[in-house]
Amino acid sequence: MSGKTLYDKIWDAHVVSEAGGEAILYIDLHLIHEVTTPQAFAGLRAAGRKVRRPDRTLAVADHNIPTEGQALGVDAVADEEARLQLKTLARNVADNGIEFFPMGDIRNGIVHVVGPEQGRTQPGMTIVCGDSHTSTHGAFGALAHGIGTSEVEHVLATQTLRQKKAKNMLVRVDGQLPPGVTGKDVALAVIGEIGTAGGTGYVIEFAGEAIAGLSMEGRMTLCNLTIEGGAKAGLVAPDDKTFAYIQGKPAAPKGAAWDMALSHWKTFFTDEDAVFDRTVVIDGSALVPMVTWGTSPEDVIPVTGNVPDPESFATPDKRAAAHRALDYMGLKAGQPISEARIDRVFIGSCTNSRIEDMRAAAAVVQEAFLHGRLVAPHVKAMVVPGSGLVKEQAEEEGLDAIFKAAGFDWREPGCSMCLAMNPDKLAPQERCASTSNRNFEGRQGRAGRTHLVSPAMAAAAAIAGHLVDVRTLFSETAQ
């Protein structure tokens, strides 16, 4: 009998019962927000049920909140539906004794930033949330994935979820990443390799020298984008970096409980003789900064590359999709992607809004400032920290001053321009270099054009006024 993968071990540890090819899984942590919970709580009330484990539930306000004027409170939120959702969440969590970080609380922020920084995300856990990018928490060796509104109600009522086990995929990224290449670039390269449907039916475990070299923030970015490759979830086995990140966090175990937890967490790894259903190997040492050109995360090329010719795609459907994407994006086949002039820059989202992301972007901006460069005159650039605590730390380090001096708008935490559900939106045909996770048509605003990049690449684009290789920005500046 072969050994078990990390996914196998977490799954087996949480099976309550199995029948008909499905299992009832126990859920360790349920993260909730204002958008996907109103109907779920209404269903509980209609059935006369209460939340089964409020202590294993954490609520934040993130999707709909404005990133300016949060001190004015929920009543000042302009959008009526958003205001109602925020008030409804506050009432529902109060009625059920659920811990809640409301808008304006320094602990509030994007749910997938808040969970880890509070120490609620831990190795070996099962974690769900009514949000696609719950896969972020897989960076800690937790089985984490998004669920629908009806499933949100089921978890609230039972602390369990009916699931069919996925297959195992290993993505091994060998070698050391070159300077300028980040977890975001690895994630985009993986999606470019397997496609947006390549992970369908799988849970992906990321391993290899390049993955071991990533910080926890980099691993969170990588796992965050797993869903864009079609996978159920993404995982990185916990190691000393993981344990160091968790230690001392508000909800982390303390004293003897820490020692016990650490011993338990160290059991979550893939056995040497475990067999994966599929293995993908990528040479991390050959990667360069990546950028999307189309309207799907798989439409990705090196920043040094040219926009592909739609006729080069293998199938009629792919060719038609590429033609449509180029028309929507206002690009031409064969043009260097670095010639794409941008109008907006967004640094934020659950993909790239942590303190490391702020530092990486600020380092580029500060270097540009020393070369006499500011945000290009035609570009509107904004930085949105992922939580109040990230914002506070960035300000303690002076990062906000660096951004503001160069012409960036420094905002309050929230999902912001990742999705057009709050005041931060693109105007039609505006082109944005964005650190978010989806470049679908209209994702950042009706007819808006999105290019996914890393924080350093986004900062470089803001300075240059067009997509640019951050590694050569300063040679361009010197010309």
Swiss-Prot record:
It is an enzyme of class 4 (lyase). InterPro entries: 3-IsopropMal_deHydase_lsu, Acnase/IPM_dHydase_lsu_aba_1/3, Acoase/IPM_deHydtase_lsu_aba, Aconitase_4Fe-4S_BS, Aconitase_4Fe-4S_dom, IPM_dehydratase_rel_enz, IPMI_cat. The keyword Nucleotide-binding does not apply. Heterodimer of LeuC and LeuD. NCBIfam families: leuC (TIGR00170), PRK05478.1 (NF004016), PRK12466.1 (NF009116). Binds 1 [4Fe-4S] cluster per subunit. Pathway: Amino-acid biosynthesis; L-leucine biosynthesis; L-leucine from 3-methyl-2-oxobutanoate: step 2/4. It catalyses: (2R,3S)-3-isopropylmalate = (2S)-2-isopropylmalate. PROSITE patterns: ACONITASE_1 (PS00450), ACONITASE_2 (PS01244). This is 3-isopropylmalate dehydratase large subunit. The lineage of its organism: Bacteria, Pseudomonadati, Pseudomonadota, Alphaproteobacteria, Caulobacterales. It comes from Caulobacter vibrioides (strain NA1000 / CB15N). Its cofactor is [4Fe-4S] cluster.
